[in-house]
């Protein structure tokens, strides 16, 4: 049994075959925002996840109108096929995928294996920045069914206790146990408290990928989640520190395994670890 929605994944071969396709736009989304300038897939444009997606004043996402303007600037219309890829096994590309889906874009795909696979296969790179005619775009709706807010998570803790829901903390075991507030080898910043949301199971996001950055098989992915009670019949909320890693796990659960009710808590530990009056847990559960 394969992936529930194989159409959302494209291979490096597929991308190379569609480099001249006017109906396709390829976007690179990296943690290292300078990486694009060192060489990228021919025709690919750059998304700076912080500058392009976040409102700097309210610490939230840009509005529907601003998203539409961003799409038009990138030459994307509502019927454009958008292909996303990036570094770090596609974690920020997956975040962009989630944000495109939140804004109701119909045809969004991830390049399986991301930037790493493209480079390792010796495929072409360029430093030339492409230019496209402006697109015509209107955000059809915002899909709140895939986004969890802090109040939703507080209510969800009760569902988890009742066996009707599941929480997945996709961070490193050290962050989950409360030993660190960020990944190992990163500056320890962003939260006053360390630990995890009570009831959460720790399934690090990177367990879902192979050494070459491609996703593991559906059978392997089910074996990763189901033994810990992360099953299709439950409402599921995933989180990390600022939602890029949890977007990757959200993609796995919703699109590769076909779980119907999965939300990404984009406030994640940066919000939860700083909130007054909410519970945390430390150690293993």
UniProtKB/Swiss-Prot annotation:
Record carries keyword tRNA processing: yes
Q: Which InterPro entries match?
A: Rhodanese-like_dom, Rhodanese-like_dom_sf, Thiosulfate_sulfurtransferase, Thiosulphate_STrfase_CS
The membrane spanning regions, by residue number, are: none
Instruction: Look up the domain of life of the source.
Output: Bacteria
Q: Which CDD domains match?
A: TST_Repeat_1, TST_Repeat_2
Q: Report, from the record, the phenotype seen after gene disruption.
A: Cells lacking this gene have a m(5)s(2)U content in tRNA that is about 40% of that of the wild-type strain. Moreover, TtuB-conjugates in the deletion mutant strain are similar to those in the wild-type strain, suggesting that TtuD is not involved in TtuB-conjugate formation.
- GO terms under biological process: tRNA processing
* PTM (free text): Cys-240 can accept a sulfur atom as persulfide forms from cysteine desulfurases IscS and SufS.
Query: What is the annotated role of this protein in its UniProt record?
Result: Required for the efficient 2-thiolation of 5-methyluridine residue at position 54 in the T loop of tRNAs, leading to 5-methyl-2-thiouridine (m(5)s(2)U or s(2)T). TtuD is a sulfur carrier protein that has a role to direct sulfur flow from cysteine desulfurases to m(5)s(2)U synthesis in vivo. It enhances the cysteine desulfurase activity of IscS and SufS, as well as the formation of thiocarboxylated TtuB (TtuB-COSH) in the presence of these desulfurases.
Query: What name appears for this protein in its UniProt entry?
Result: Sulfur carrier protein TtuD
């Amino acid at each position: 049994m394969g992936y529930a929605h194989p159409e959302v994944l494209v291979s490096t071969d597929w991308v190379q075959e569609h480099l001249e396709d006017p109906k396709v736009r390829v976007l690179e989304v990296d943690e290292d925002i300078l990486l694009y300038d060192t060489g990228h897939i021919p025709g690919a444009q750059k998304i700076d996840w912080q500058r392009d997606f976040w409102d700097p004043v309210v610490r939230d996402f840009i509005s529907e109108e601003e998203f539409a303007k961003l799409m038009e600037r990138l030459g994307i219309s509502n019927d454009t096929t958008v292909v996303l890829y990036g570094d770090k096994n596609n974690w920020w590309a997956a975040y962009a995928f989630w944000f495109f889906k939140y804004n109701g874009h119909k045809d969004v795909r991830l390049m399986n294996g991301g930037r790493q696979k493209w480079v390792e296969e010796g495929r072409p790179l360029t430093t030339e920045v492409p230019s496209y005619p402006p697109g015509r775009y209107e955000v059809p709706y915002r899909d709140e069914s895939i986004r969890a807010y802090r109040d939703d998570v507080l209510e969800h803790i009760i569902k988890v206790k009742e066996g009707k829901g599941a929480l997945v903390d996709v961070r490193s075991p050290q962050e989950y146990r409360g030993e660190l507030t960020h990944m190992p080898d990163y500056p320890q910043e962003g939260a006053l408290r360390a630990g995890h949301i009570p009831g959460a199971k720790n399934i690090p996001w990177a367990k879902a990928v192979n050494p070459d950055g491609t996703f593991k098989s559906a059978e392997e992915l089910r074996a990763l989640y189901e033994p810990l009670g992360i099953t299709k019949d439950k409402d599921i909320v995933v989180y990390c520190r600022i939602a890029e890693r949890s977007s990757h796990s959200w993609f796995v659960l919703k699109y590769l395994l076909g779980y119907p009710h999965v939300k990404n808590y984009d406030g994640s530990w940066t919000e939860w670890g700083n909130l007054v009056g909410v519970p945390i847990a430390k150690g293993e559960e």
